[in-house]
């Protein structure tokens, strides 16, 4: 879905910054990590044409997907940032996901009470990068 919509959105909004936080749902559906990686790289290529600064968020998936798939999936994010202009941002739910009180019963999505923690985390991650690029 994201790849199909991205070019139109980039042309419409002409952003200076783009944060890609995608791939998790594809992983939860068991899509091949190589395909997810290819889609993310295609998206980054579209964004690079617009000269926007690109941040790519590391995505993690639950351990019940098996260590082999999990490692293959989670390793695509650092690899992509080694070969593109995207800057890797740590997974925003790293601390939140470990606290059941902050997560919905599905164990994947955060509760409303987690939002201030996520906002603070994102602020701390992005502020130095935004300041650096201005």
Model features per residue range: what roles?
Residues 1:
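N-terminal beta-loop-helix "entrance" segment that forms/cooperates
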Residues 4-134:
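Alpha-helical cap/lid subdomain in secreted, periplasmic
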């Amino acid at each position: 879905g994201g790849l199909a919509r991205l070019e139109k959105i980039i042309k419409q909004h002409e952003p200076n910054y783009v944060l890609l936080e995608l791939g998790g749902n594809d992983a939860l559906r068991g899509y091949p990590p190589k395909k997810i990686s290819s889609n993310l790289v295609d998206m980054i290529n579209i964004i690079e044409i617009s000269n926007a600064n690109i941040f790519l968020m590391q995505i993690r998936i639950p351990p019940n997907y098996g260590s082999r798939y999990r490692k293959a999936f989670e390793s695509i994010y650092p690899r992509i940032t080694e070969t593109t202009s995207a800057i890797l941002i740590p997974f925003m739910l790293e601390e939140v996901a470990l606290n059941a009180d902050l997560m919905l019963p599905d164990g994947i999505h955060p509760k409303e009470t987690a939002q201030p923690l996520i906002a603070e985390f994102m602020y701390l991650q992005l502020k130095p990068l935004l300041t650096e690029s201005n």
